[in-house]
Each structure stands twice: as C-alpha cells, then as structure tokens.
C-alpha cells in the first residue's frame, strides 16, 4: 500500500531535480552575455559553478529527506514503492532521463552506494529507449541555397542572436562558400539543405554554430566557430564539414559545451546524426550533462559485459606507480584504481590524487586531458577477472576490495576513455607517424601549460593517442597549476668535478623544475631527439615556461582551437 510519505519522498526528489536543472539552464543561458562581453574569466568560473550544481542539489535533497523521514531506515518494499511512484511521474516529464540519474544519486548518497539493485534505482531507464527520436519541437531551422549559396549564408549568419557587429561579414561568407565548394560539388550544393541549431554552443572563447548539411545520400556536419577580434568584432574562424572533425570538436578531452537545452534527450538525438561515432554517454557529457553521462557510461559498460565473455585484464603499457589500470580487451574504456601504497619515489598522498582528478574535472581540459567518471562500490563477477589481474588487485589495492564470494566490490575507481599509450605508439611508429606524434605531444604540453596546467610527470607513458591521432594526457597524480612551479635554469658548474658528481651542485626546492632536464628523459631515442629539437626545443628552456607563467599572471586567457591552426581562414590560402 502506497502511503503519503512515499509520495512525498518521490515528489521531493523530482522537485529537487527541477531546481537543479533550472539553475543549470540559468548558468547556461548566461553564456551569450559572457561571450559578448569577452569575460573569459567569468566563462571559466561559470563552467566550474555549473559542474558543482548537481552534487550541491543532491546534498540539499538528501538533507530534506532526512528531515522528512526523521532519519528512519526503511525496508526493501518501501524503497521499491518510492521508485515506482517516481517512475509514474516521468512519462510526461521532459527531462526524464536525467531525473532518473538524479534519483540514483540521491539514493547512493543516502545509502552509501550500497545495495544498488534495479528494483531500488534506475540501473537502466524506465522509459522507452531514445524516446525523443521524434523531436517534440524544432531544435533547428532549415535553409536552402536555391542557387545563391552566399545569399543563404548571409541569412544564416544574420539570423544569429549575437548582438555584436561583424568584423567583415562579406569576407567570411566568401571564406565559408569557398570552403564548401572545396569539399562538395556545385551540383551537390545546389540541392543541399542546411539545418542550423537554434542555440549556439559556447565553449572557451568561441560560440559555435552547429548545423547539418543534408545531401541526397549523406548528412555532413556544418560547424562554424565564431570568435572576437581585439576590437570586439565577430569573425568566423573556419568551416568544418567532416564527421572526424566534428568528433574532435565534441571530443572527450574537451570542456563541456554550454548550450541551452531544456530537452537534453532531444538535443542528443539531433546531434547523433553528425556524430555517429559518439556514444550516448559522450553526447550527454558534451552538452554538460556529465552526471547523466556517467549513468550512460555505466549502462554501456553493463551492456558490453552482458554481450561478451571477455575477462578483465591488466591494461597494456607500463604499470603505474600510483594507479592500477585494467580493462576488457575489446572495450573502449579503462578502469583506474588508486593503489593502497605508492612507489617510494612518489611523494603524493591518496587525498592529493583525488584532488588532482577533481581539478581536471573542473578545469578547462583544452582537448588535452581525458575526462573521467568516478564510481564507488563497483561490482564485478569474479569469474570475469583474469588470474593475473585478481592477483594484482589483491596485492595492490586490498583495502579497496570487498570479497562477496562470486563477486568483488572495488570501493572506488575511475572509468576513462581507452587510448594507445604514447610510449607504445612511438615504438611501433614509422617516421611520419613518429614526427606527427612528437608534434602532437609538444602541442599538448604547450596547450596545457597555456591553460595553467603543468603535467608534472611528462614521460610518454602518461599520454595516450586517440583514434584521431591526437595526444592526450591521462595521468594526473602529479598535476599542478603552472603558477605553483618555479622554473629554473641549471646554474653553471663551479668546478669541472661538479658535472661528474652524483648529487647536484645546486640547491633544489620541492617546486623547482629544470626544463633542461626534459631533454635527457624525453630524447633518449635519436629520431625522437631530432623531431623534438626541430619542433619543440623551446620546451627545454626555463625562459619559455616563465613567459607562459607571466601571461597567466597577467590574466591572459589563451585561444583554444578544436582544429589545426592551418585550418583557420586566417592561416590558409583560399583559392
């Protein structure tokens, strides 16, 4: 029998989610103003604020429920009825899928991530799969060239909500039209239909027009990043029309977009067509619904495990001194557990490692740091764990294991996108691949540094290569802000004997870094040394790093491009 208390609990949770998502939309709606004001520090603050909203509102609801129930414990039947009532509130609810995740979060906070069974929380959704395949209201407007591509582009750009003047709109329209004609024939463009999202996608210092270019036999992305010039005028920086380029723009190593999406499921469905390689989890994360993205990641994991018979194995690559990393051979993610004891040379605590991972979650990842999802009390069937991995788990993380007989519980782990470790990639690379990898590695270091992130441990084993060939950092236990580091030149030796001594002839403080030393541990291979010296020798000079520090201290926020600089209209010759 359903009681008023059960109904009150269900309604309180849904009202709490309503409040959270209302604040989420409120912060998101401010993105246009922040962009128009070129208030880049406010952009960074809003990003962190929006990430914190979810956990904050979960905490508020948990306190409400403790007050309502007088902190009583309830039996299984009571909890099942609460979920049934909550499920009954969702069929006509516009954000049902995230409301389910919010319910899960409240349950987990109340019951310490214990007893996570489908009868008590939404392990899988209660609603029809992809309910918004037919979108209830238009998310985009349609445009057709009708023999005048430039005229159509002018209508599209003049229709944008931005209130700033264009630097040179006819020039940009010419650039876009030329770029389109370089990728598509006149016959294709003559019958093309363009769909442009009603809302702009804001991230970093850009506002992205996101659209689709529909041809008779295929749909392509149509992406235009809009930037400021120094005088406050707007300009289009490039035109991207390949699905590979779109995948990088919406990549897992980038900050979440701010896009006004009162119907997030509908937005995800609309994006799916131009991002076919992205999972549902990745699409939700891309639009800022990272907690529901975590739910979808777990569901994707459960589906994979159910459909395969693979065993969990130790992840390929050099074993970490702080993290134990394992995976499934065909799964596109890895699982990372903080070891109970670290290698002696690692002067870091477990608390500090947790702080580092949270820092990455909240910071601008500039396309160079992999996003992670954090789980507690992660259950794995023991027969799915290889003997080697089980031994490793029992040796390295016994304090984080709970043995249930046929299953084990890992009390805390991170799930992260799987990549090819850079050191393994380099070992197998041909000369061109090696050159590209070193160029990417150096660019990753420089872009992280410009965003006020110093990786700490810069060895190749701490970086991965994505399927698009991008180099991404993924080992965060020594990460810190650039402004916390003291970059020093190595003093000249006092005597010839100094260079032969086992100890340095100069004092070294905890935050001291000597970039000259990077050459010794990064360039042991002669080919690597050659490419490094050719493209990134500035990384070996303390003056380079101090210059970046000064720009950060001066309040400068660097541009972040989700495409190669040579693709910028200002960098390439439009023929």
UniProtKB/Swiss-Prot annotation:
It catalyses: L-seryl-[isocitrate dehydrogenase] + ATP = O-phospho-L-seryl-[isocitrate dehydrogenase] + ADP + H(+). Pfam families: AceK_kinase, AceK_regulatory. Keywords: ATP-binding, Cytoplasm, Glyoxylate bypass, Hydrolase, Kinase, Nucleotide-binding, Protein phosphatase, Serine/threonine-protein kinase, Transferase, Tricarboxylic acid cycle. GO terms for biological process: glucose metabolic process; glyoxylate cycle; tricarboxylic acid cycle. InterPro entries: AceK_kinase, AceK_regulatory, Isocitrate_DH_AceK. It comes from the Bacteria. One of its GO terms (molecular function) is protein serine/threonine kinase activity. ATP binds at residues 315-321, 336. HAMAP family: AceK. Belongs to the AceK family. This is Isocitrate dehydrogenase kinase/phosphatase. It comes from Yersinia enterocolitica serotype O:8 / biotype 1B (strain NCTC 13174 / 8081). The gene is aceK.
């Amino acid at each position: 029998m359903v009681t008023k208390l059960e109904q009150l609990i269900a309604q309180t949770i849904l009202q709490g989610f309503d409040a959270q998502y209302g604040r989420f939309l409120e912060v998101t709606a401010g993105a246009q103003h922040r962009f128009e004001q070129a208030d880049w520090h406010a952009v960074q603050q809003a990003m962190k604020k929006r990430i914190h909203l979810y956990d904050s509102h979960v905490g508020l609801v948990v306190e409400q429920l403790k007050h309502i129930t007088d902190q009583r414990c309830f039996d299984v039947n009571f909890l099942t009825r609460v979920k049934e009532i909550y499920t009954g509130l969702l069929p006509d609810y516009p954000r049902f899928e995230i409301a389910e995740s919010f319910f899960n979060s409240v349950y987990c906070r109340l019951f310490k991530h214990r007893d996570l069974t489908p009868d008590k929380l939404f392990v899988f959704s209660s609603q029809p799969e992809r309910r918004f395949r037919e979108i209830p209201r238009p998310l985009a407007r349609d445009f057709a060239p009708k023999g005048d591509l430039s005229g159509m582009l002018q209508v599209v750009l003049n229709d944008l909500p931005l209130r700033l003047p264009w630097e040179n709109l006819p020039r940009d329209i010419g650039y876009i039209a030329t770029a389109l004609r370089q990728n598509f024939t006149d016959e294709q463009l003559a019958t093309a239909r363009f769909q442009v999202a009603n809302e702009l996608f804001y991230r970093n210092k850009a506002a992205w027009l996101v659209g689709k270019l529909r041809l008779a036999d295929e749909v392509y992305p149509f992406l235009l990043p809009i930037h400021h010039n120094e005088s406050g005028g707007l300009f289009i920086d490039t035109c991207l029309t390949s699905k590979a380029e779109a995948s990088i723009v919406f990549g897992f190593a980038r900050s979440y977009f701010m896009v006004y999406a009162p119907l997030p499921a509908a937005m995800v469905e609309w994006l799916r067509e131009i991002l076919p390689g992205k999972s549902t989890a990745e699409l939700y994360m891309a639009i800022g619904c990272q907690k529901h993205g975590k739910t979808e990641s777990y569901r994707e994991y459960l589906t994979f495990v159910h459909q395969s018979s693979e065993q969990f194995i130790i992840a390929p690559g050099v074993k970490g001194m702080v993290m134990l990393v394992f995976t499934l051979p065909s799964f596109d993610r890895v699982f990372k557990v903080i070891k109970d004891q670290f290698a002696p040379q690692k002067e870091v605590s477990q608390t500090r490692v947790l702080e580092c991972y949270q820092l990455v979650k909240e910071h601008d990842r500039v396309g160079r740091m992999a996003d992670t999802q954090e789980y507690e009390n992660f259950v794995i069937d023991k027969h799915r764990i290889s003997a080697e991995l089980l031994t490793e788990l029992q040796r390295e993380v016994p304090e984080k294991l709970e043995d249930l007989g046929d299953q084990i519980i890992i009390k805390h782990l991170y799930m992260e996108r799987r990549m090819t470790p850079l050191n393994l990639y380099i070992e197998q690379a041909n000369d061109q691949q090696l050159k590209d990898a070193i160029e990417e590695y150096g660019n990753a270091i420089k872009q992280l540094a410009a965003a006020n992130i110093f990786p700490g441990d810069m060895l190749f084993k701490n970086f991965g290569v994505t399927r698009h060939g991008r180099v991404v950092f993924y080992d965060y236990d020594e990460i810190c802000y650039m402004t916390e580091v003291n970059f020093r030149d190595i003093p000249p030796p006092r005597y010839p004997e100094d260079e032969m001594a086992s100890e340095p002839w100069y004092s070294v403080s905890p935050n001291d870094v000597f970039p000259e030393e990077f050459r010794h541990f990064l360039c042991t291979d002669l080919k690597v040394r050659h490419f490094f010296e050719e493209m990134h020798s500035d990384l070996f000079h303390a003056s380079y790093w101090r210059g970046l520090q000064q720009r950060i201290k001066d309040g400068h926020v660097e541009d972040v491009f989700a495409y190669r600089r040579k693709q910028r209209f200002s960098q390439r010759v439009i023929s």
